[in-house]
């Protein structure tokens, strides 16, 4: 993996990632394809919205279809017919989500399969082996996602376990498996600055190809998330990609880019599309509102997606009211293209030296003031 920093405006960075299956321009948003498919999308649809990289999930693909099937296809790329880069989450967050169904020990995590209730064991080494079979361009370490809220003592204990697991991930990925694909560390520590420092410094000692901010978008208030983003990205290596996991709303992505983050993923655009909530240049359209019954306009006149070029809001309203699956499909195409256009717009603005104007326009269209952002002296 190679990362080049091509430009900067304040803390916002313009970069380029060269991976096994292609080049990724940053800032970038990665559509989530948990089970080897982005919900409601054909692989060609994902190409049409100009996604550069997608995300798969180790935990779910391990449980179903299982490694044997994916091995027979020579990896995840051929299995799902996607020839561009893939990042796979290690499964740590999904295990965290199981709550009482899991037991965490030094060796790893034992849990009941949400599919059939059978006992499953996942460890740093097993996570690395799964991701090796998947042949992910970017492999994430197996960690424990610190819950919110957590006391200082709980968050510290959790991050220290994650650091010990991170060491094991690196050793297995590099030394045992000889995996040439990129391996990213994940910074934990909850909402505590000293613990975020401890986690980051521990990961830097081990050494990774990129660094992710974990443990956000887990129920904390937005102000807490912004506090972490004010503080942490600028302390992360300037010559390595920075990835904010599981975030989020368009405003959150803009604010994170302003603070120096490069990579994002979130289920929000796909999940919202299935509920008739569509992101547009001026904010949000809730298509089930009866005011759209006779609306002859496109969903977003500024959008170049298949949905906006071909269908009216009235038609989308009709599909939603009838419960047609096409509503979710067209909405997903639009929402994911919106997120691609958002990050494209930021890349262009960073290339052209107009990033501040981009941010001003983004908020002005929503009738909002631009929030404050740290400025380096």
UniProtKB/Swiss-Prot annotation:
Pathway(s) this gene product operates in, as recorded in its UniProt entry: tRNA modification; tRNA-queuosine biosynthesis
Chain sites annotated for binding Zn(2+): 303, 305, 308, 334
Required cofactor(s): Zn(2+)
MF (Gene Ontology): metal ion binding; tRNA-guanosine(34) queuine transglycosylase activity
Region (RNA binding): 246-252, 270-274
Catalytic activity reported: 7-aminomethyl-7-carbaguanine + guanosine(34) in tRNA = 7-aminomethyl-7-carbaguanosine(34) in tRNA + guanine
EC number(s) given by UniProt: 2.4.2.29
Pfam family, one: TGT
Record keywords, A-Z: Glycosyltransferase, Metal-binding, Queuosine biosynthesis, Transferase, tRNA processing, Zinc
One GO location term (cellular component): cytosol
Gene3D superfamilies linked: Queuine tRNA-ribosyltransferase-like (3.20.20.105)
Active site residues per record: 89, 265
Biological processes per GO annotation: queuosine biosynthetic process; tRNA wobble guanine modification; tRNA-guanine transglycosylation
Free-text comment on the cofactor: Binds 1 zinc ion per subunit.
Annotated positions binding substrate: 89-93, 143, 188, 215
Job description of the protein: Catalyzes the base-exchange of a guanine (G) residue with the queuine precursor 7-aminomethyl-7-deazaguanine (PreQ1) at position 34 (anticodon wobble position) in tRNAs with GU(N) anticodons (tRNA-Asp, -Asn, -His and -Tyr). Catalysis occurs through a double-displacement mechanism. The nucleophile active site attacks the C1' of nucleotide 34 to detach the guanine base from the RNA, forming a covalent enzyme-RNA intermediate. The proton acceptor active site deprotonates the incoming PreQ1, allowing a nucleophilic attack on the C1' of the ribose to form the product.
PANTHER family given in the database record: QUEUINE TRNA-RIBOSYLTRANSFERASE
Family (UniProt): Belongs to the queuine tRNA-ribosyltransferase family.
Protein name: Queuine tRNA-ribosyltransferase
GN (gene name): tgt
């Amino acid at each position: 993996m190679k990362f080049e920093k091509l430009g900067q405006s304040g803390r916002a960075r313009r970069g380029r990632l060269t991976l096994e299956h292609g080049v990724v321009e940053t800032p970038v948003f990665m559509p989530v394809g948990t089970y080897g498919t982005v919900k409601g999308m054909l692989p060609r649809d994902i190409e049409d919205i100009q996604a550069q990289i997608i995300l798969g999930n180790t935990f779910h693909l391990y449980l179903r279809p299982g490694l044997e099937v994916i091995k027979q296809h020579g990896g995840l790329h051929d299995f799902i017919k996607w020839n561009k880069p893939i990042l796979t989450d290690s499964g740590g967050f999904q295990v965290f989500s199981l709550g009482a169904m899991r037991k965490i020990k030094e060796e790893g995590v034992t849990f009941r399969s949400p599919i059939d209730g059978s006992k499953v064991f996942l460890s740093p080494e097993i996570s690395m082996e799964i991701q090796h079979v998947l042949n992910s361009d970017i492999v994430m370490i197996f960690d424990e996602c610190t819950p919110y809220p957590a006391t200082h003592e709980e968050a510290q204990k959790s991050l220290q376990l994650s650091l010990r697991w991170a060491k094991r991930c690196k050793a297995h990925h590099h030394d045992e498996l000889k995996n040439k694909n990129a391996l990213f560390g994940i910074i934990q520590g909850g909402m505590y600055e000293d613990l975020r420092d401890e986690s980051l410094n521990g990961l830097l000692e081990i050494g990774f190809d990129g660094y992710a901010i974990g443990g956000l978008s887990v129920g904390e208030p937005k102000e807490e998330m912004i506090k972490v983003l004010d503080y942490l990205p600028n302390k992360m290596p300037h010559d390595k990609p920075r990835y904010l996991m599981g975030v989020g709303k368009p405003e959150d992505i803009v604010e994170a880019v302003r603070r120096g983050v490069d990579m994002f993923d979130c289920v929000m655009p796909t999940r919202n599309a299935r509920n008739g909530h569509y992101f547009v240049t001026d904010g949000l359209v809730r298509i089930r509102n009866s005011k759209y019954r006779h609306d002859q306009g496109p969903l977003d006149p500024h959008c170049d997606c298949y949905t906006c070029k071909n269908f009216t809001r009235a038609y989308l309203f009709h599909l939603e009211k009838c419960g047609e699956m096409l509503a979710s499909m067209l909405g997903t195409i639009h929402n994911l293209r919106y997120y691609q256009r958002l990050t494209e717009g930021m890349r262009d603005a960073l290339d052209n030296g107009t990033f501040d104007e981009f941010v001003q326009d983004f908020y002005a269209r929503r009738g909002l003031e631009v929030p404050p952002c740290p400025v380096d002296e």
